[in-house]
C-alpha cells in the first residue's frame, strides 16, 4: 500500500561485521537516498547478521507485519559459507521474478566477471517485492540504477493496477 503516494520501502543490511558494529554500513544509507525517486519512503531499516533464520524472520516482519511494498536487502549474496541471503529469501517468497536479477547480473558483467558469482534473487511475498542487492556500495548503486526504472510499474502491478503492461 502506498502512503502519501509513496511506496513503503524496508532496507535490511545483512552483515556480521555491521551487526557487531565493526563496520559502518554505507550501502543502507545509499539505498535510502536512491529510492527517494521511486517515490519511496523508508519505513524500516535494520542491520542483521548473516544468519538464515534471522533473515527469514526480518523479511517476514517487513512483508507480513509492516506491509512494505519493497524490501531491499544488501549483502550476503556471494559464495562464502556465511552468504545466506538468497537462501533465506527463497524460503520466504511465493514467486520468483528472475528478470530483475538477470538484468542486474547482465549489467554487472559489463564491469566485472565476478558478477557471475552473485546468487541474488528477486521475488514476491503477498504484495511485497523482495530484492537482494550486493553488499558493496559501488555494486548497490550499479544494480539499483538498472532496476529503478522498472520498480514503480512492478510495485503498482503488485498492488493490483489494472492498466496494460504494454507501452507504445
Predicted regions and their residues:
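Non-catalytic beta/alpha edge segments that cap or flank active sites
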Residues: 1-168
Amino acid at each position: 500500500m502506498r502512503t502519501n503516494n509513496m511506496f513503503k520501502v524496508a532496507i535490511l543490511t545483512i552483515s556480521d561485521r555491521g551487526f557487531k558494529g565493526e563496520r559502518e554500513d554505507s550501502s543502507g544509507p545509499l539505498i535510502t537516498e536512491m529510492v527517494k525517486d521511486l517515490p519511496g519512503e523508508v519505513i524500516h531499516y535494520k542491520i542483521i547478521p548473516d544468519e538464515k533464520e534471522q533473515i527469514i524472520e526480518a523479511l517476514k516482519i517487513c512483508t507480513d507485519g509492516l506491509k512494505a511494498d519493497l524490501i531491499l536487502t544488501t549483502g550476503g549474496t556471494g559464495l562464502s559459507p556465511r552468504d545466506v541471503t538468497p537462501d533465506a529469501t527463497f524460503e520466504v517468497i511465493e514467486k520468483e521474478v528472475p528478470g530483475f536479477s538477470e538484468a542486474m547480473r547482465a549489467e554487472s558483467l559489463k564491469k566485472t566477471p565476478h558478477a557471475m558469482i552473485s546468487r541474488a534473487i528477486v521475488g514476491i511475498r503477498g504484495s511485497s517485492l523482495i530484492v537482494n542487492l550486493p553488499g558493496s556500495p559501488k555494486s548497490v548503486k550499479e544494480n539499483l540504477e538498472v532496476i529503478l526504472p522498472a520498480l514503480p510499474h512492478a510495485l503498482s502491478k503488485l498492488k493490483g493496477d489494472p492498466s496494460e503492461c504494454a507501452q507504445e
